[in-house]
Amino acid sequence: EFSFNGKVVLCYPKIKDGGIDAVVDNFVREIKKTTGVKLVKDRLKDGLFLGLHVEESTKKGDAHIVLYVDEYMLKEAYRLSVTPKRINIAASTPAGFFYAFQTLKQLMPRNVMAGVPDDSVEEWRVPCVFIVDEPRFSWRGFMLDEGRHFYGKEEIKKIIDVMAAYKMNRFHWHLTEDQGWRIEIKKYPKLTEIGAWRDSKVCAWGDVKPDGVRYGGFY
């Protein structure tokens, strides 16, 4: 098992597509929030010397999470190897590293994926595994219809988090139609003043009587 309880250094190189910093920062922030563990970031300008740099650092006794760029892998593919002192992750794009981090979190206690702290966990561990994963389909989508029912910003954020956990990559957001207009356009204010609201709603199957309560909303 790999333990997060000691000092853990996250080493990663600069990649030409950009975006790796945002992926790493998001993972570090989520681990800190859910486990209290503060990962030490170590960003190298030149990935060619990443392996040598890690070997020197490992001699000090630190555990490592190391990101390697493998340009021969598919855009969203990743390779994850967990050993007692090191986690190696290889991918060709920030998306691949992002999905690898999703899998890594799923190997940890369940509160990590839930995004909440758990004070009952005494030691944060990940089992030793070797995983090679790549998508079968390039378009893995979820469609939400808010023309008929308005969910609101916080619920949408939860849905996107769940999509990320399942490694879905397309959010089809249905916002406008004659049943409800959910996006504000300053030039056409009546679209939301009138189109975003209705005077009542039918609450349940078999009960077709409107409730008489004004309903709606927009972004």
Where are these regions (language model features)?
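Contiguous, structured surface segment used for ligand recognition
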Residues: 1-139
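Single-residue recognition of alpha-helix capping/boundary positions
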Residues: 16-20, 155, 187
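Generic, well-ordered alpha-helical scaffold segments in large soluble proteins
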Residues: 30, 107, 159-162, 166, ...
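Short C-terminal domain-edge/linker segments immediately following a structured domain
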Residues: 42, 118-121, 172-176, 202-206
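Beta-rich nucleic-acid/ligand-interaction surfaces
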Residues: 48-58, 178-189
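The substrate-binding groove and active-site-proximal loops of carbohydrate-active enzymes
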Residues: 90-91, 140-153, 194, 207-219
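Aromatic- and acidic-residue-enriched carbohydrate-binding clefts of CAZyme catalytic domains
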Residues: 135, 179-219
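A conserved hydrophobic secondary-structure block that centers on an alpha-helix together
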Residues: 144-178, 182-185
